[in-house]
């Protein structure tokens, strides 16, 4: 009985140590989440406006000869997949990869992975990667996003792939994060996603002409969408980690309560047994 009580006591200490770690991780995630949420909300209007501008130009110039605007005969797709660098974030990475698998089913595709978990996922499944130089999403800067955009534009013009899609996680709220696949190029894909109904926002005259402006801002457009996706995904990952660590802390507290109850019962049984033995010994005298 004594050895059993000792094992329970050690188990309680072990769970308490784990609970301290999960509580600390929850507090760190909460602290980082506030900044990430603010960054995502600040970035969103700019990238939304940039996307609307390209749709506006494309709608008014359906006879574009730009390779970025017309439908591509190349059916290969390049997915820009933004995952996390670490685990312990609930189903954040798993749900993202399920979304990718559903979108890529039956397609010829390759991936530009952003984040360590995305790189690991590709290696485990032998999926072709455009590059692995952006393996740490936590270290990605705006300059890196422009480098990614220029790389994507170069390979798109070369015909390496004919479609570019962004796979990331949308931050809806602290309790809701939704993985999503978003078509970036060619513009014909975006027009098709909208059911061919892209309404003109403003009557704007582009100089020297719409196509020149369009080609010039496409790399910035891609960089903007990638950076916006990173901001959204980072906020989503931190929110998912905070929820996971909060659940882990609650489970640890519940487990400690159960172990304490078991320990107290075992201790009470041990004391009762000792009293019984003393009484029996006294009666024998």
Where are the model-predicted features located?
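C-terminal beta-strand-loop-alpha-helix "lid" module of Rossmann-like NAD(P)-dependent dehydrogenases
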Residues: 1-285
């Amino acid at each position: 009985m004594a050895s059993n009580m000792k094992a329970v006591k050690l188990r309680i200490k072990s769970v308490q140590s784990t609970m301290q770690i999960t509580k600390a991780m929850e507090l760190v995630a909460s602290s980082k989440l506030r900044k990430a949420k603010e960054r995502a909300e600040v970035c969103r209007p700019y990238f939304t406006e940039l996307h609307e501008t390209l749709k506006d130009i494309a709608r008014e110039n359906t006879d574009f000869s730009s390779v970025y605007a017309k439908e591509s005969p190349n059916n290969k797709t390049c997915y820009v997949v933004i995952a996390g660098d670490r685990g312990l974030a609930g189903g954040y990475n798993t749900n993202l990869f399920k979304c990718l698998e559903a979108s890529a089913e039956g397609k010829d595709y390759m991936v530009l992975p952003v984040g360590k978990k995305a790189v690991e996922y590709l290696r485990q499944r032998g999926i072709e990667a455009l590059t692995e130089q952006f393996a740490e999403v936590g270290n990605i800067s705006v300059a890196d996003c422009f480098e990614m955009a220029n790389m994507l534009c170069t390979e798109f013009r070369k015909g390496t792939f004919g479609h570019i899609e962004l796979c990331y996680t949308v931050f809806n709220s602290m309790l809701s994060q939704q993985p999503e696949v978003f078509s970036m190029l060619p513009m014909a894909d975006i027009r098709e996603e909208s059911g061919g109904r892209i309404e003109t926002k403003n009557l704007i005259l582009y100089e020297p002409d719409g196509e020149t402006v369009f080609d010039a801002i496409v790399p910035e457009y891609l960089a903007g969408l990638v950076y916006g996706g990173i901001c959204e995904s980072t906020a989503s990952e931190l929110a998912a980690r905070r929820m996971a660590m909060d659940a882990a802390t609650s489970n640890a507290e519940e487990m400690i309560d159960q172990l304490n109850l078991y320990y107290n019962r075992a201790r009470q049984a041990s004391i009762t047994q000792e009293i019984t033995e003393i009484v029996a010994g006294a009666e024998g005298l």
